[in-house]
Amino acid sequence: MSIRRKALIAAMALVAVAALWFATIVPGQNSTAAVQRTNDGKPNLNGIWQAVTTANWDIEAHQAEPGPRPEIMGAWGAQPGGLGIVEGGAIPYKPEALERKRQNLKNRMVTKVTNDPSRFDSGDPELQCYRPGVPRANYMPFPFQIFQGREQILMIYEYKASIRQVYVDPHLEAPVDSWMGWSNGSWDGDTLVVDVKGFNGHTWFDRAGNFATDALHIVERWTPRGRDHLMYEATIEDPNVYTRPWKISFPLYRRLEPNVQLLEFNCVPFVEELMYTPLGLYNPPDRPSR
């Protein structure tokens, strides 16, 4: 048998194996038999989860680009490319809101530091260590942990130890607006549905300047697709910013390393010089105050 014929047979065998693989494992296929369950029969969402996406840089499709201050940051500050998580490709901005988004991108590294605690008209809130809000907390490059109960579900995010309390029974109204909003949950079969309102209007969705106001309303759907991964979907509406509701979706994966746990990421000390030097309130820790 010639070498060329052997190579052809090997290639055909490889194609057959690949075809069998893709025929049996379809992306998004619901494998409910493998879903872990709690004592009351609900899907067991307990554990540490993390997204594998570049959405924190930009939730829309984007190419790799240099980041802010490339003369200092080089490749460290570069933006990786990504296919985006917005269904349909583009966010349906109103014209004036799209212009604000463009200004946000232009000014993402600007910090207008003042003594007025009610002002947040500056760059990306992540740059200044503010809480990320929803849905951004779910796709930042940090893990988060879910503690599931019948009446409440607790979500703790490694980034700044941000917390969400999902009220399943009974539902409660938000007492005040906040960075992470107010979450009420219910079960639709095996899907956890979380209705989120009560935002303070200061959060961004990513480093590209995509944003919403305090009229933001989000409906999340957390659906198990197997033993160790979920499909996350969120319908987003804000009549101040968008012409219609729109959706994002991406998978979440359970972290399975031995002794996996959330570690501390307290970013406040990392931004003290950035935030307080313009006010004359910062003294480096290795230099005595004057």
What do the predicted segments below correspond to?
Residues 2-290:
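PEST-like low-complexity, intrinsically disordered acidic/proline/serine-rich tracts
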